[in-house]
């Protein structure tokens, strides 16, 4: 498979730096380009703000400054064998956009870089990302442990849809002790799943605690980092193994595209637990016996998700959606900072209002998760979402919603406009109290 990564080939001229001058730079800051995908430069020593703009795609002389939209389903080859090598996963290249596309891969490379991962894949929605992230290493007869305070759609995915596929899930309190979380594990448990900041309860995850329990039981920790974004938190730095996103939210920021992402840290040792993860460590007969961990190393997990799940299930985002997502990513740090500062002011206002009985926002010093936010989030920031309860209960909430003038009632968060949602009436309507 073809993956957007940095491989040293030839030096390129960029920002007035000649190839001869760049040759004297340390390897960590040398401007280099990839042999297969033009224009990628190593961004490890750059600030996240710079990565949001430059990572994933940097044009060479005479090439477009903006990321091109490769609006094509197929790709030309000159011989039968050339294309055959691609289908056997023995060569790099593109052959069908349902699996991979140059526009999509450039944006995936950027998100992987922002999270500090080794590889990433984009999906057509955040729900598709979470489905693939779990299903890539689970099958009928397996078991998942998940935090109970997660997005309602993800809760139903794990509790209902996966059950139909023969995969059971046990939910644990996010505030549970390590011993209590570990008690939920079974011999067939394959995944521990949680959200960095729970949607919509805004519970802040103790990532190190969950990572320790996961690794003590020989499973990876998958963390949905949608609400925090890599601007505020990078879960890999705290022990998480795989990160997912609904890129529809802050990464897009303008409510113009639906998408998701899965990023692999490359840190989980699948071979050490090969008896559990045989889909990665044993021959895949649908690809002439390829063993993903042997052939693709740290990129085994993402390669399997791309070559197997995308092949069979689809859920690839359109190149145009990825182009729009990339535009959003370029301003992500600026927007997240302003989202958080605005949310902080509103949370403080609501917290002092007589008709508000409770405010959930970890930026408030008295919030239950304030200390965790200070530990895991940059500058203690969390996100631009606030949840609060009115003194009149559900009826008061409905009256409040129906009286809004400027704010919009919508099933969304993290756009440029203020949106208000009543979870009990909308996103979590299928759940009980």
Model region roles, listed by residue range:
Residues 5, 9-11, 16-27:
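Intrinsically disordered, low-complexity segments enriched in serine/proline and basic residues
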Residues 1, 31-32, 40, 159, ...:
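PLP-dependent enzyme catalytic core of the Aspartate aminotransferase-like
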Residues 79-131, 153-161:
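Conserved N-terminal alpha-helix of the aminotransferase class I/II PLP-enzyme fold
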Residues 41-101, 109:
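N-terminal "arm"/small-domain region of PLP-dependent enzymes with the aminotransferase-like
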Residues 74, 265-268, 390-393:
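Short loop segments at secondary-structure junctions
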Residues 44, 52-58, 120-352, 360:
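Conserved PLP-enzyme active-site core in the AAT-like
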Residues 336, 344, 348-351, 355-433:
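Conserved C-terminal alpha-helix-loop-beta "cap" of PLP-dependent enzymes
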Residues 59-61, 251, 314, 376-378, ...:
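Short Gly/Pro-enriched turn/cap motifs at secondary-structure boundaries
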């Amino acid at each position: 498979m073809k993956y957007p990564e940095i491989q040293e080939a030839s030096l390129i001229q960029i920002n007035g730096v000649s190839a001869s001058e760049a040759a004297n730079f340390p390897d960590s800051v040398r401007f280099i380009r990839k042999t297969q995908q033009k224009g990628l430069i190593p961004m490890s020593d750059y600030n996240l703000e710079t990565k949001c703009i430059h990572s994933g795609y940097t044009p060479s002389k005479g090439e477009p400054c903006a990321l091109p939209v490769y609006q094509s389903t197929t790709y030309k080859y000159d011989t039968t064998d050339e294309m055959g090598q691609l289908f056997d996963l023995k060569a790099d290249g593109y052959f069908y956009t349902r699996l991979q596309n140059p526009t999509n891969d450039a944006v995936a490379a950027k998100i992987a870089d922002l999270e500090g991962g080794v590889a990433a894949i984009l999906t057509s929605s955040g729900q598709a990302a979470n489905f693939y992230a779990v299903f890539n290493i689970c099958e009928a007869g397996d078991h998942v442990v998940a935090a109970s305070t997660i997005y309602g759609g993800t809760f139903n995915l794990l509790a209902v849809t996966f059950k139909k596929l023969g995969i059971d899930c046990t939910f644990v309190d996010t505030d549970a002790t390590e011993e209590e979380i570990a008690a939920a594990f079974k011999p067939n448990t394959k995944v521990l799943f949680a959200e960095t900041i729970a949607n919509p309860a805004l519970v802040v995850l103790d990532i190190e605690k969950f990572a320790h329990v996961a690794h003590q039981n020989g499973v990876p920790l998958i963390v949905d980092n949608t609400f925090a974004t890599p601007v505020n938190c990078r879960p890999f730095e705290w022990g998480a193994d795989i990160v997912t996103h609904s890129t529809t939210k802050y990464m897009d920021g303008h409510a113009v595209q639906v998408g998701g992402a899965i990023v692999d840290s490359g840190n989980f040792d699948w071979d050490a637990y090969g008896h559990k993860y045989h889909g990665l460590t044993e021959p895949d007969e649908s690809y002439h016996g390829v063993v993903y961990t042997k052939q693709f190393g740290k990129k085994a997990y993402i390669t399997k998700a791309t070559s197997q799940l995308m092949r069979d299930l689809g859920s690839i985002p359109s190149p145009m959606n990825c182009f729009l997502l990339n535009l959003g990513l370029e301003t992500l740090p600026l927007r997240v900072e302003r989202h958080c500062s605005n949310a902080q002011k509103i949370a403080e206002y609501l917290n002092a209002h007589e008709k508000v009985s409770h405010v959930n926002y970890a930026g408030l010093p008295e919030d239950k998760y304030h200390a965790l936010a200070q530990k895991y989030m940059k500058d203690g920031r969390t996100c631009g979402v606030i949840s609060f309860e009115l003194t009149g209960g559900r009826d008061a909430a409905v009256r409040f919603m129906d009286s809004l003038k400027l704010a919009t009632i919508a099933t969304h968060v993290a756009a440029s406009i203020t949106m208000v949602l009543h979870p009990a009436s909308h996103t979590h309507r299928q759940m009980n109290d």
